[in-house]
Amino acid sequence: MLLFAVVWGSGACLSVNAATKRPFVLVIDAGHGGKDAGAVGQLTKEKDINLNVALALGRLVEQNCPNVKVIYTRKTDVFVTLQGRADIANRNKADLFISVHTNSSPVGKAAPMGAETYTLGMHRAADNLEVAKRENSVITQESNYKQ
């Protein structure tokens, strides 16, 4: 979040996709939602934190970068399938897709601090596949996940 605040606070906004001459499209995905709570703490659920962060990020972009088109995969506590999230990004020809997730830690452990950013590269395709399988195991909650 700080990186976005610094970049947009300095007035450095992308406004047009140079290759297509159309507005830059940012899709913000609030991870989990609806029947998929994500990590559950004593007082919070990941889906709620993700939604609040995604909406705050979107507002920050909208207020500081009026030429950036912001699209959300969800603005309320609803379940959106993984395919549905991809469809939203693809249908809108997203230039950037940001999926917001938060971590949890076991009770009694020191509270983690900081941020993590994950990107997939082709240099470790086998490892990436295992991560993708683990992260996408939520797909079994979808009614038609065997398709």
Residue ranges of model-derived segments:
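Bacterial N-terminal signal peptides
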Residues: 1-11
